[in-house]
């Protein structure tokens, strides 16, 4: 391959990355989400702050009366319309006595921003949030992009001594290795991220994972189509750090925290929804909402008691 073709291919990879990752993420208003009101007694405090880029960030504190003092979680959502897609997880932690701090990143959900500025923007938002609320005795827990965010926060903040990464990635280049064959192409995206965010784009999680004395719990399914197991959890295992425990699960794809029944239900209902949209059978907002009338969202978000039990024991120890 001559140089011009190689550069053209790298440019295409960067464009695909921008088009799929660096966009605005809002709710599909037809798709149901759990609400705080679905959980009697759950308290939600909503606030905002302006981040260093001038974007208004919405953040939330969830808890039940009688929560245990100094048992705080920072829940880092995955890429998508914000924390509301994770209310089942958040409520599970609150029910166990934790206070949960969470946020919608720049360009996501209720927060401002025309798009997500970079994959490291959530890290910046979360760090600035922690600096604001002063909950320094806190455990980051995150899924997917949120898993990467939780990992970076644990790396960056000495006060964090424990973190949970669910289906997360080590770096953006390791994430891209699930979609491209050559490391040189994946590294192109890493260099692009450094240009987008020179401060947070240079984070070296590999060195951190090799040497850290922090306690980390990493949970990943071997058949994850979104974040490749071998290039992420597999690399963590190879480092052999005794302070990091990797729980490998099978047949859970990108959501190992969900029960098998919830995954089957979600795949069937959402698959049917997307198919009917493609077939132009759900052409109006009313028709799309009606599709979910007999499909309670709680059946799509039921937590796996074994996996959540492992997480709760880890963060409670």
Regions found by a protein language model. Name each.
Residues 1-51, 55-62, 274-290:
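An N-terminal hydrophobic leader/cap segment in hydrolases
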Residues 79-91, 230:
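The serine-hydrolase catalytic nucleophile loop
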Residues 80-83, 108-133:
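Catalytic nucleophile-loop/oxyanion-hole region of alpha/beta-hydrolase
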Residues 90-112:
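Conserved alpha/beta-hydrolase
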Residues 152-201:
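Hydrolase active-site cap/lid region
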Residues 212, 218-220, 224:
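Short beta-strand/loop motif that positions the catalytic acidic residue
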Residues 243-317:
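C-terminal catalytic histidine-bearing segment of alpha/beta-hydrolase fold enzymes
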């Amino acid at each position: 391959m001559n140089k011009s073709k190689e550069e053209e291919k790298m440019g295409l990879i960067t464009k695909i990355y921008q088009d799929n990752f660096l966009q605005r993420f809002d709710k599909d208003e037809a798709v149901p989400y759990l609400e705080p009101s679905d959980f009697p007694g759950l308290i939600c405090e909503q606030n905002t702050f302006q981040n260093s880029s001038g974007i208004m960030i919405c953040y939330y504190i969830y808890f039940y009366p009688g929560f245990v003092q100094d048992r705080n979680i920072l829940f880092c959502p995955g890429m998508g319309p914000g924390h509301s897609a994770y209310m089942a997880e958040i409520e599970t932690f609150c029910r166990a006595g934790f206070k949960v701090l969470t946020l919608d990143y720049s360009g996501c959900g209720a927060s401002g921003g025309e798009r997500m500025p970079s994959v490291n923007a959530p890290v910046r938002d979360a760090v600035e949030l922690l600096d604001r609320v002063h909950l320094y005795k806190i455990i980051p827990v995150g899924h997917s992009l949120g898993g990467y965010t939780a990992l970076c926060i644990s790396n960056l903040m000495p006060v964090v001594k424990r973190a949970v990464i669910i289906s997360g990635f080590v770096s953006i280049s390791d994430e891209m290795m699930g979609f491209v064959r050559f490391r040189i192409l994946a590294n192109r995206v890493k260099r692009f991220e450094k240009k987008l965010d020179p401060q947070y784009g240079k984070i070296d999680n590999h060195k951190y994972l090799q040497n850290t004395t922090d306690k980390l719990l990493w949970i990943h399914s071997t058949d994850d189509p979104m974040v490749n197991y071998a290039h992420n959890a597999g690399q963590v295992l190879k480092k052999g750090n005794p302070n990091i425990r990797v729980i490998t699960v099978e047949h859970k794809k990108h959501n190992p925290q969900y029960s098998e029944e919830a995954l089957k239900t979600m795949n069937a209902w959402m698959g049917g929804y997307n198919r009917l949209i493609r077939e132009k059978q759900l052409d109006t907002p009313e028709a799309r909402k009606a599709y979910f009338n007999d499909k309670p969202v709680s059946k799509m978000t039921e937590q796996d008691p074994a996996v959540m039990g492992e997480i709760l024991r880890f963060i409670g120890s």
